[in-house]
Amino acid sequence: MVAWEYALLVRRYQGQGRNFHVSFVWYGPDGSRRDVTTYGDTAIAHLNRVGREGWELVAAAEDVNNVQGSTEVHRYHLKRPLT
């Protein structure tokens, strides 16, 4: 039987008009939280990076709030076999 570990990559877009900020945060299987924004400016860049580390995307979800400005939160759920 295969045992898995799980992680979460969160992309947050916050903006109003021409001003916006995009950040990426990695929630590791050990409970750690790390800002990984400097590793790339697109979700694809981040997913390819962790894919090379053995992570597989298993689900994605998006929340959008346009009440005051614009906020988008994308959650990428990943897994990989425990070694």
Identify what each model region corresponds to:
Residues 1-83:
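Terminus-proximal functional modules
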